[in-house]
Amino acid sequence: MSIEIANIKKSFGRTQVLNDISLDIPSGQMVALLGPSGSGKTTLLRIIAGLEHQTSGHIRFHGTDVSRLHARDRKVGFVFQHYALFRHMTVFDNIAFGLTVLPRRERPNAAAIKAKVTKLLEMVQLAHLADRYPAQLSGGQKQRVALARALAVEPQILLLDEPFGALDAQVRKELRRWLRQLHEELKFTSVFVTHDQEEATEVADRVVVMSQGNIEQADAPDQVWREPATRFVLEFMGEVNRLQGTIRGGQFHVGAHRWPLGYTPAYQGPVDLFLRPWEVDISRRTSLDSPLPVQVLEASPKGHYTQLVVQPLGWYNEPLTVVMHGDDAPQRGDRLYVGLQHARLYNGDERIETRDEELALAQSA
């Protein structure tokens, strides 16, 4: 079941929380709405579900406009962060609930309900807990019950609001893998909300990064990591080093040092330079690729690599976080050398194109 979100706007009083949002979600795709608090991601999810109504715009399921349909008529499964299980019902009865309250003409008979719930219990690996009550379950088990209950009515679309937010780190990891496997098996269309970058990129087919009621980028997880569309995405998606300097001619000036860019940008003046920790070139010896001296402040072994916090020597005030591969891990106090050739340059929120990007733009003009 595909979802088309067309020009959705939403205001609460004078506060605009969604600004002309448009997004197409193909049938069978799992999409993460990712962003900080106040980005509008949960409001958008609730509008898809019919739990909130947009100020303007349309929601279509497989081409059918459902914008004015009540939530109960949209055939959407919704899983809340805090489970919303019925405390007085067993696990079995919680999962069966949605089936037992269907209109009489749609309601399965008791034997069919039992068979379906039994199958779902096996699917979520909780058959041995069918007679327990929510108070007797762990957080991860409760979330599986909530998911099984949502799937019981065979929803066209499954929506999840911060589904793992209330769980500890290890349980979250296990449930993420389990949900991804379940999605591969059942091929349902799903949208989930999260503020956790790792969760979004691990589980989703596509990540939609939101900020202040706008979509900043909607792409495959790897694309969002490697090719951020905006400065916000670059800074939000994981750790990043920022250096403030100036472009003069074909060089980036930082402190008393200059770094050749290999081309002369059209823009000249103050810039912010961004590098992910693994994008910083680092060496024990100075070279044309790694000419800038740093001193190791912290060294944290991470298995096949070492994460370092290094202090630039004479060319910048703020420490940098970098990654160094190999068995010969540096020690605190060691001198190393770094290079900046994989950097992204911004003037405010505007990206300064590299030479290859400038050539591509010129050829397409």
UniProtKB/Swiss-Prot annotation:
Gene Ontology CC: one annotated term: ATP-binding cassette (ABC) transporter complex
InterPro entries (UniProt xref): AAA+_ATPase, ABC_SmlMolc_Importer, ABC_transporter-like_ATP-bd, ABC_transporter-like_CS, Mo/tungstate-bd_C_term_dom, P-loop_NTPase, Sulph_transpt1
Subcellular location, principal: membrane
Gene assigned in the entry: cysA
Domain annotation ABC transporter: ranges: 3-237
Membrane topology reported for the UniProt record: Peripheral membrane protein
E.C. designation(s): 7.3.2.3
Function: Part of the ABC transporter complex CysAWTP involved in sulfate/thiosulfate import. Responsible for energy coupling to the transport system.
Compartment(s) where it occurs, according to its Swiss-Prot or TrEMBL record: Cell inner membrane
CDD domains reported in the protein's UniProt record: ABC_CysA_sulfate_importer (cd03296)
Family named by the database record: Belongs to the ABC transporter superfamily. Sulfate/tungstate importer (TC 3.A.1.6) family.
SUPFAM superfamilies in the record: MOP-like, P-loop containing nucleoside triphosphate hydrolases
Subunit field text: The complex is composed of two ATP-binding proteins (CysA), two transmembrane proteins (CysT and CysW) and a solute-binding protein (CysP).
Cystine residue pairs: none
Catalytic activities: sulfate(out) + ATP + H2O = sulfate(in) + ADP + phosphate + H(+); thiosulfate(out) + ATP + H2O = thiosulfate(in) + ADP + phosphate + H(+)
GO molecular function: ABC-type sulfate transporter activity; ABC-type thiosulfate transporter activity; ATP binding; ATP hydrolysis activity
Keyword list, A-Z: ATP-binding, Cell inner membrane, Cell membrane, Membrane, Nucleotide-binding, Sulfate transport, Translocase, Transport
Organism: Escherichia coli O6:H1 (strain CFT073 / ATCC 700928 / UPEC)
Protein name: Sulfate/thiosulfate import ATP-binding protein CysA
